[in-house]
Amino acid sequence: MYGLIPMSCRRSVLALPFLCAIAAAADLVDFNRDVRPILSDRCFGCHGPDANKGRKAGLRLDEFAGATKQLKSGDTAIVPGDLKRSAVIARLNNTDPDEVMPPPELHRPLSAAEKDILTRWIAQGAKYDPHWAFVSPKQHPAPPVKATDWPKDPLDRFILAKAEAAGLRPSAPADRATWLRRVSLVLTGLPPTPAEVEAFLGDQSADAFEKKVDALLASPRYGEHLAVAWMDLARYADTWGYTGDNRMFAWPWRDWVLRAFNENLPYDRFLTEQLAGDLLPDATQDQRVATAFNRLHRMTFEGGSIAEEFRQDGINDRVMTAGYAFMGLTVECARCHDHKYDPISQRDFYSLAAMFGDQNENGLLPYHGEVPPPFVRLFKSDEERAKERRLRDAVTAAERALSAVPPTEATISTVTVPTPVVHLPLETFTKSGVDNAIAGGKPAKFERRGAPEDLQLVPGVQGQAIKFDGDAGFILSDFRQIGRFDPLTFSAFLRLGEKNARATVLHSTGFYTGDGDATGIELLVDHGKLRWSMIHLWPNSAASIETVDELPVGAWRRVTGTYDGSSRAAGLHLYLDGREVPTKVIRDTLHAKPRDNALEIATRSRDAGFRNGSLDEIQVWRQALTGAEVATLHGLAPTTWPAGLAREHARLRADAAYATAWAALQKARRELAAHQETAPAFYAMEHSPLAPPTYVLTRGDYDKPEKDKLCPPGAPASVYPWDPKLSRDRLGLSRWLTDPRHPLTSRVIVNRLWAQVFGNGLVASTENFGLQSDDPTHPELLDTLAVDFVRGGWNTKALLRRLVLSATFRQASTPTAAAREKDPANRWLARGPVLRLTSEMIRDQALLAAGTLVEKVGGDSAQENARRRSLYTFRKRTAPPDSMLIFDAGSREVCQPRRLNTNTPLQALVLLNNPLFAESAQKLAAKVATVTSNPRDQIALAFRTVCTREARPTELTALERLYADQKALVAAEVPAPPPPAPDAKTKKAVAKPADPAMVALTRVCATVFASDAAVTSR
């Protein structure tokens, strides 16, 4: 019977199963493509990952298990394959405003098509697929295409296949001048000069395009251009922000970025050095400078600011910035609660925060403008760096030599306490101060805070003592120069009148604007415990110890603190009544010398003094007393001394070998410190075991840590599992991010570079690869490029070279009628990219055309009217350059992962009236006027200089008409020359009348700068 069927019909019958399969595939709902966008946009806000804000009805729709489990009501939201039992279907089609989903107050009703998608999806089994961006990328073979002679690179076949499927054909190649302008702007941010265009057009060699791209990639301009987008991500600025908005000398980090791009530092190292350069073995100065990426957030020194609040804000900013820059995720949404859309919990956020909060730091800026620690010293030359290494080695050798000195055999029969340089008996006081009992010693002056009559004479241990009110106190104005290598001893009888939360007993730190400004020697009572410190800047650059036990209230105790000048916490000791007491180390990282302030007692400006506390018999030595001397000072008999105290005293006072070794060590330390202090300090990261633990903060509030939710350092396992072999620190985080199988890191940077070349990313939401992201237009291409990028050594220049030499990039940008109708946004890339230049490119182009661009690479930032490239323009966070803001640059207060182009009348006003553009128009007019005197040729040359092409006849005619109109207008306005000065001695210059032709030509040049041809790359 089959043989009776005609051949044509027989072929149709054979094709039926294939056609049915195609129809079935077309009808099959894809979860990631069709369903997830609907659920994410309409449902996840109430039924998503966030459990903290009371997930509605206990229903979770972002995962299969949650969507298909039975609810307390007895209903099941989704029963795969069963529409009648799936409560979601009934809710979608309900007309009751109290029952329908999404609820009317969301103002996002589902369309009929969206309801149909969800219905068919459930009917087909409600299959859940993981979000595409959380699946490791894999390489795909280039698809077959019809126009096989068009692709120049395998990536072109991915583009062409999509275009052909959409019924589009690729555009013809752009002319060579257009391509040259396009590629020059993409790779360097500057257009080619007329001479460069002429040279390229004259090069007819087979590899002319490749040679030009290689030259652009080798230019210093390349790194300057690529750095701008990274500076947006890193929130680079030249001031700290907030009210004071003080100067922030951050440009060494910017210069590191320039060098990294120009030297083609592999992206995995680029990432690692910025996140954790300080944790690399034998970290170099440059690698530590790179970590300033984490320190570029805003800070303040404003009085009344709470250090912990701003410390937490800074850490949160670091987490947010790293999330955007390296993962393309909005992780900051999980600061207050579990992420509404992405599988990032609040614990995940604070585990990341533990990575970035590993600093021993203060949340506030030092009031005096010093670099807030931790920091790295910026030595200018290899010789200076080598000298520092030698001096460090010398300190290490001296420490070993000191520890190698054998125990002393010497003994001292009698211990004599040295005479102090200050002794204040405090038997009485006057309005001017208190007497110093040391012969020739100057009295302690009354510090004019509070009133002397507020002090009280009370019975002391030896005669009278003084009880303080917390405001008034005394200052030893001639007792200064207490350096980090200067030994010191303080002793006094002390009585607490109350359990002070904080009380200043002694300090040389000047006035107080927060712990971050404390600098000098300091003895505090902190919640009843004694804290003895030598401080450069608290808390990172300090040596500090604290008693384990609290002082009793109301009892006299003789407190003695000694410091041996070693810059180490081990050199600090505390004694009570002649006996050393147990202490714990609070800080042990003293990096620099304190400021030179006078010694003050019981008072400090803007801080709590020794309120209701009493002092008697204050003594100060410019040396560190030994334990035996302290015991003798208190009258303890040698028979009561701890074992070994006498031998230690003999070692310190009578052992010549030990004294020589100690002097050599202190000399080595001083020489190292002196050399280090010749180099400026610069912001860096430095891991510290003394960093406070990280807890989940309720609603993200700094003062509401949930102590039962300690968060060790970690990363979201829902994004990519953590390898247990990795260290739980920033270096481990960078290794986790640069794992070749990590689903986000390579995709995010490849997509960002694609967007730089083509205007839009393969994923349009370059800043967001989470569940709210746009789907990739060419997912297989994105994955393949990401895999190739990693396998090629994370080579940024190689990837950009590949993109700009592709047939896709070389296309003309003018759309055909069919392309305009089928693909108005150019998603399928059947034509070349059209890009509005950034604010930096527009400004730099004007300076280059005018011949005034100063091409100095690197160095300190310049003011807006300077003629350097725009990335060097001084960026004040509270008042950014207005011309840049108008062209969509940000304030750099926070990370800006993407600039959104706008078109406003203000942009034309900037181009026509901004002083820099006005001056550039004048310079360009003068330049072309020296080449030719013919107005038409002048206009044509000006246009060609700015726009890198010949003006079209209509453009040239319009500009000539403008020139003629402006020349006539100016000629009519020019006044007659003023009469000569009557007095030959008059120094006043005679105004030269304006040249109508030059004024008109200048206005034509300004118009060219403001034209679409100038501000657009086509």
Which ranges hold each PLM region?
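Extended surface/linker regions that mediate inter-domain or inter-protein docking
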Residues: 114, 211-346, 352-353, 357, ...
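Extracellular glycan-interaction patches encoded by glycine-rich segments
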Residues: 595-616, 632
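Extracytoplasmic low-complexity segments
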Residues: 382, 387-471, 509-515, 589-592, ...
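Extracellular glycan-recognition modules
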Residues: 269, 283-288, 417-449, 456, ...
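Carbohydrate-binding surfaces in secreted/extracellular proteins
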Residues: 335, 561-585
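Short, aromatic/His-centered strand-loop micro-motif at the edge of beta-sheets
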Residues: 533-558
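Primarily short, surface-exposed interaction patches in extracytoplasmic proteins
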Residues: 146-181, 186-221, 235-283, 343, ...
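Solvent-exposed helix-loop boundary motif
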Residues: 25-165, 177-182, 192-200, 239, ...
